Amino acid sequence: ERILVSGDNRHVSYNEPKAMQEYLVTHAVAPQDVVVDYAGRSTYETCMRAKDVFGLQRAVLVSQGYHLPRALYIANSLGLDSVGMAGDLRLKPKADYQSVREWAAEVKAFLNLKYFPPDVLLGDMKPIK
């Protein structure tokens, strides 16, 4: 089994996949078991790339609990058979910026999946074995 970490790294000071990789390696995951995707700029793109670049058919998505329903909706709608696991203990977001952002992201996910699929940087296949 391998772990695919994917996220945004468009800015020099912001590198989600590198931070995830470093965390896993410092917590006893062998470096060769961590596959890094630097082009997952959104949940939609991460799921498309997991399927179309890394050749995954099934996945366990690990994310914040409040984010999981949207991530699973996107992954399964794109044909990536997925289940989820919350990586935090926060049961419900507070009525703050994050919950407003998540609501907007849910609307965007629906529109992307039904009407306006975004361009996804795919590239060559790199199947995970």
Question: Can you say where each PLM-predicted feature lies in the sequence?
Answer:
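A structural signal for short, hydrophobic/glycine-enriched beta-strand patches
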Residues: 1-99
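A transmembrane-helix-recognition feature enriched in membrane-embedded lipid enzymes
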Residues: 96-122
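A short, charged, Gly/Pro-tolerant segment at domain boundaries
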Residues: 121-129
